């Protein structure tokens, strides 16, 4: 059997990629939405209105237990989007690898294999970029829009109107914007729904909008002379100590299906979230995995 079929296997590609990523931290999306896998492509999730705890009713001894209504829930079903893409191993590389195998020169063999494995891990990097983009789209808008290779699909997680707000003043205008007041108002709204925001997700450009606003300087340094500025450390300290928010900066870009560079998290948008997991990135089974489970792999 040709060397390529012995060496270029899914297990070896995974091992090669894992070694490359050994010292790379998890992305914000991977931390907030850890991965898990299920059988099939049907995703069911429960949407409820849990929020404020309702105190238990008092009762006398030796009386019937009063029954509480369960919270209103909706069971939603979605068909998972399916993505696949391949990359050819060039005929020249295959031929060269087979020739080198006869020489027993492992150093030269490893050089060619490294080129092939790097091509394969490009696909993995592309898949991870797609996942991160979808996670950040959910965080920033509550929706996922897919328009790729003839496939059009929208997934709406049903954010209520009261869960989003738009400032009356553009944060990019430092003369009139008051982002800290807007954030405080949003925190009050979230708290009234029975939740406590513990972190704020935004990109560096939006962070600069907040930092550079004149109203921010006045709030953090009320006695500072005209023209004073607020440092990044001072703003982070204020958000942490005064508003109880941990800063989660999400920067970076990816190339979308139209070949355009796009930011993972949009400018001028912030999202208030609790600490810890926000949900899961659920993977269904691919046709190839399904065949392997059924013993029909070819």
Segments (PLM) and residue ranges:
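N-terminal alpha-helical "arm" segments
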Residues: 1-44
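Short secondary-structure junctions and interdomain/linker hinges
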Residues: 20-27, 130, 134-137, 190-197, ...
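Assembly/oligomerization interface modules of large self-assembling protein complexes
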Residues: 33-102
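Charged, low-complexity intrinsically disordered segments
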Residues: 51-53, 66, 141, 155-156, ...
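Long, contiguous amphipathic alpha-helices that act as assembly "spine/axial" helices in icosahedral shell
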Residues: 84-160, 178, 182, 188-205
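Short acidic (Asp/Glu) and glycine-rich catalytic loops that position anionic groups and cofactors
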Residues: 162-164, 215-216
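Ordered core of a single globular domain
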Residues: 181-229, 233-238
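Sequence/fold signature of self-assembling virion shell proteins
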Residues: 217-298
């Amino acid at each position: 059997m040709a060397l390529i079929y012995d060496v270029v296997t899914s297990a070896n590609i995974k091992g090669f990629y894992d070694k490359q990523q050994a010292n790379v931290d998890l992305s914000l999306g991977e931390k907030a939405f850890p991965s898990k896998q299920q059988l099939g492509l049907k995703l069911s999730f429960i949407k409820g209105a849990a929020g404020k705890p309702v105190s238990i009713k008092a009762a006398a001894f030796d009386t019937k237990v009063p029954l509480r209504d369960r919270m209103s829930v909706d069971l939603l079903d979605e068909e998972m989007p399916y993505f696949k893409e391949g990359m050819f191993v060039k005929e020249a590389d295959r031929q060269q690898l087979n020739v080198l195998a006869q020489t027993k020169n492992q150093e030269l063999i490893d050089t060619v294999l490294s080129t092939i494995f790097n091509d394969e891990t490009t696909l993995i990097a592309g898949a991870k970029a797609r996942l991160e983009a979808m996670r950040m789209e959910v965080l920033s808008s509550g929706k996922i829009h897919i328009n790729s290779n003839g496939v059009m699909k929208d997934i709406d997680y049903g954010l209520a109107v009261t869960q989003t707000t738009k400032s009356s003043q553009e944060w990019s205008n430092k003369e009139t914007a008051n982002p800290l007041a807007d954030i405080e108002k949003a925190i009050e709204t979230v708290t009234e729904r029975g939740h406590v925001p513990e972190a704020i997700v935004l990109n560096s450009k939006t962070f600069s909008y907040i930092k550079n606003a004149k109203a921010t300087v006045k709030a953090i340094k009320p006695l500072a002379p005209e023209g004073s500025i607020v440092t990044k450390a001072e703003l982070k300290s204020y958000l942490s100590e005064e508003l109880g928010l941990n800063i989660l900066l999400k920067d970076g870009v990816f190339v979308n299906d139209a070949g355009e560079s796009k930011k993972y998290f949009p400018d001028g948008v912030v999202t208030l979230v609790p600490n810890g997991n926000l949900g899961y990135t659920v993977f269904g089974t691919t046709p190839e995995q399904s065949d392997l489970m059924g013993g029909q792999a070819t």
